[in-house]
């Protein structure tokens, strides 16, 4: 039986899955990074934990290993940020948010998965006999149909009699139809252009990306208050005030600039790029990072130097902490906030906006289209 089906069966039957250091059933280990084999059932043989499964990444059809799949199941109740961080620390390939959700739903039996290929469903009992019986019936029926065709005589009816035998030239009619189709297409195209123009303008809102790292000082819980009101709330405190759990997937905020060239602008803030379309990257103006390169793994520009050539980079730290090496290695700007003295926050945020606006005016390709 396939390893994915064995895992799903073990989950359904609530059986203990054993991680093994070797193919011996007695070599049990606790940590997944120490495991070389995995045992789902005492009646089956241990399976190499790094063997590819039939759970694939749709973008390139690459197969996730059994280690990646099982680790995603073990951390199913953790946030996506914490899961990605642990994958990075252990060197395990991580699944994206949508891939992990899809996998967990399939393992729990609540839905099918488009990421899983080539799994054979078990045949119901008696299916072979039923198929044989059906083949016999079909063969018998085909003989009867052939007999009917051989002994059927075609007769004329009022429809066949009215059919003419003289060939008719429809070229002139075909030309009229083509002219009508082209005229309709031109009208529809002009109407579509009128509808699309305001939509394109609305969709030019610049995008800010946050780091999903658990060590990030700016999260989806506290970023809006920080950038709009100039007040920094520690991430743990902000998450607690919001009732815990994951923050929103998308935040829209307005910023009124002191520079008359900018006026009031609307920014979109997201943490992950799973739902990004290719043209969204033209709208990304800023990336907040913690200095961990795994953050950019699924970005259009996954290499830090290349990324921060195209977007403005910020790295937020507490006052008194040593400057992170990324501030000079990657060309990102360090932003320092006080741990306790909140009266300094507004000035820090004002300086951040000034730096971002200057970058947008000089470097952002879509800036000219917004003026």
Swiss-Prot record:
Pfam families: CDC73_C. It is found in: Cytoplasm; Nucleus. Its main location: cytoplasm. It comes from the Eukaryota. InterPro entries: Cdc73/Parafibromin (IPR007852), CDC73_C (IPR031336), CDC73_C_sf (IPR038103). Keywords: Activator, Cytoplasm, Nucleus, Transcription, Transcription regulation. One of its GO terms (cellular component) is nucleus. GO terms for molecular function: RNA polymerase II complex binding. Coiled coil: none annotated. The keyword Membrane does not apply. One of its GO terms (biological process) is positive regulation of transcription elongation by RNA polymerase II. The keyword Ribonucleoprotein does not apply. The PAF1 complex is a multifunctional complex. Involved in transcription initiation via genetic interactions with TATA-binding proteins. Involved in elongation. It regulates 3'-end formation of snR47 by modulating the recruitment or stable association of nrd1 with RNA polymerase II. Component of the PAF1 complex which consists of at least cdc73, paf1 and rtf1. Belongs to the CDC73 family. This is Cell division control protein 73. The lineage of its organism: Eukaryota, Fungi, Dikarya, Ascomycota, Taphrinomycotina.
């Amino acid at each position: 039986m396939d390893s994915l089906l064995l895992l799903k069966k073990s989950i359904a039957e609530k059986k203990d899955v054993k991680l093994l250091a070797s193919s011996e059933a007695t070599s049990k280990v606790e940590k997944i990074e120490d495991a070389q084999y995995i045992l789902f059932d005492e009646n089956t043989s241990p399976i190499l934990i790094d063997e590819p499964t039939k759970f694939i990444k749709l973008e390139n059809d690459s197969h996730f290993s059994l280690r990646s799949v099982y680790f995603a199941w073990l951390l199913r109740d953790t946030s996506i940020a914490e899961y990605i961080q642990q994958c990075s620390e252990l060197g395990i390939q991580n699944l994206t948010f949508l891939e992990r959700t899809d996998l967990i739903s399939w393992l729990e039996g609540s839905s099918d998965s488009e990421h899983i290929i080539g799994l054979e469903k078990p045949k119901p009992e008696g299916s072979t006999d039923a198929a044989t019986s059906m083949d016999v019936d079909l063969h018998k029926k085909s003989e009867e149909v052939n007999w009917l065709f051989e002994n059927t005589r075609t007769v004329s009816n009022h429809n066949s009699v009215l059919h003419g035998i003289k060939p008719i030239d429809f070229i002139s009619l075909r030309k009229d139809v083509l002219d009508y189709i082209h005229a309709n297409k031109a009208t529809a195209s002009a109407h579509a252009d009128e509808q699309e123009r305001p939509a394109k303008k609305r969709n030019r809102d610049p995008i800010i990306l946050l780091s999903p790292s658990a060590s990030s000082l700016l999260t989806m819980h506290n970023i809006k208050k920080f950038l709009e009101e100039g007040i920094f709330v520690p991430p743990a405190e902000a998450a607690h005030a919001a009732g815990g759990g994951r923050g929103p997937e998308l935040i829209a905020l307005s910023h009124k600039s002191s520079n008359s060239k900018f006026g009031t602008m609307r920014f979109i803030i997201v943490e992950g790029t799973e739902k990004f379309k290719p043209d969204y990257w033209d709208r990304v103006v800023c990336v907040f990072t913690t200095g961990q390169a795994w953050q950019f793994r699924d970005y259009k520009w996954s290499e830090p130097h290349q990324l921060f050539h195209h977007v403005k980079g910020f790295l937020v730290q507490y006052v008194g902490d040593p400057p992170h090496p990324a501030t000079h290695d990657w060309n990102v700007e360090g932003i320092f906030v006080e741990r306790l003295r909140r009266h300094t926050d507004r000035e820090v945020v004002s300086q951040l906006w000034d730096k971002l606006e200057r970058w947008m005016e000089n470097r952002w390709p879509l800036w000219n289209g917004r003026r």
